[in-house]
């Protein structure tokens, strides 16, 4: 199984990058997980033609059996870099339709506060379910990781909190089954 884990920010430092890297390492026996950075994607503009970075991004999604989105929360929503990346996959102006159509998607995230990027995750799910995306999002498979600074080692990126690891294990196993069902 081939999964694409998208780091949902262009920030130099991100606990969500640590989260994607943790998943790629922990579940390497269950799936090939490629961590993908969106930092170099150009800002979406409807009139612009997609450059090679955008084409690479769309092709990575097309080639994956499923996509994992790890998003932080900025001002009760997803970062503008992630929104822009999703606009590249959903815009009909550049023939991008169907990049995410029926693609199994998992959304999770971590934040400094107590709510674990809950509003950003909800916004991301709404985007994925929009008519221009039409992704296949597993309902109820949520992982809200609050107080990221207390749960990750800032220097190594290691996830230290066993309760959080258990929650991710459950959600990831659900997602793997979901992807397998979608492939039938």
UniProtKB/Swiss-Prot annotation:
Q: Which UniProt keywords apply?
A: Flavoprotein, FMN, NAD, Oxidoreductase
Phenotype upon knockout? Cells lacking both LJ_0548 and LJ_0549 completely lack the NADH-dependent flavin reductase activity detected in wild-type strain, and show a 40-fold reduction of hydrogen peroxide formation upon exposure to oxygen. Reductase activity and H(2)O(2) production in this mutant can only be restored by in trans complementation of both genes.
Presence of the UniProt keyword NAD in the record: yes
Segments crossing the lipid bilayer:
none
A molecular function GO annotation = FMN binding
Output the InterPro entries linked to this UniProt entry.
Flavoprotein-like_sf (IPR029039), FMN_Rdtase-like_dom (IPR005025), NAD(P)H-dep_reductase (IPR050712)
**Pfam families listed in its UniProt record:** FMN_red
**What GO CC terms are in its UniProt record?**
cytosol
Subunit and interaction comment = Requires LJ_0548 for activity, but the exact composition of the enzyme is unclear.
Give the family, as the similarity comment puts it: Belongs to the NADH-dependent flavin reductase family.
Q: Which purpose does this protein serve, as stated in its record?
A: Component of an enzyme that catalyzes the reduction of free flavins (FMN, FAD and riboflavin) by NADH; the reduced flavins produced by this reaction likely spontaneously react with oxygen, yielding hydrogen peroxide. Is responsible for the major H(2)O(2) production in L.johnsonii in the presence of oxygen. Cannot use NADPH instead of NADH as the electron donor.
**Protein name per UniProt:** NADH-dependent flavin reductase subunit 2
Organism listed in the record = Lactobacillus johnsonii (strain CNCM I-12250 / La1 / NCC 533)
Its gene?
A: nfr2
């Amino acid at each position: 199984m081939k999964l694409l884990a998208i780091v949902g920010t262009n920030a130099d430092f991100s606990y969500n990058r640590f989260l994607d890297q943790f998943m790629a390492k922990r579940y390497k026996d269950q799936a090939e997980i490629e961590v993908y950075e969106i930092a170099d994607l150009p800002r979406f503009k409807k009139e612009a033609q997609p450059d090679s970075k955008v084409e690479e991004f769309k092709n990575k999604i097309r080639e994956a059996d499923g996509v994992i989105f790890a998003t932080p929360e900025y001002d009760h929503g997803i970062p503008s870099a992630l929104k822009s990346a999703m606009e590249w996959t959903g815009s009909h102006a550049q023939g991008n339709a169907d990049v995410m159509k029926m693609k199994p998607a998992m959304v999770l995230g971590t934040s400094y506060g107590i709510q674990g990027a809950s509003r950003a995750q909800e916004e991301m799910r709404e985007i994925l379910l929009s008519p221009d995306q039409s992704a296949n999002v597993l309902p109820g498979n949520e992982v809200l990781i609050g107080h990221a600074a207390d749960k990750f080692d800032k220097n190594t990126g290691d996830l230290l909190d066993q309760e959080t690891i258990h929650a991710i294990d459950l959600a990831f196993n659900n997602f793997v089954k979901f992807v397998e069902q979608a492939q039938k």
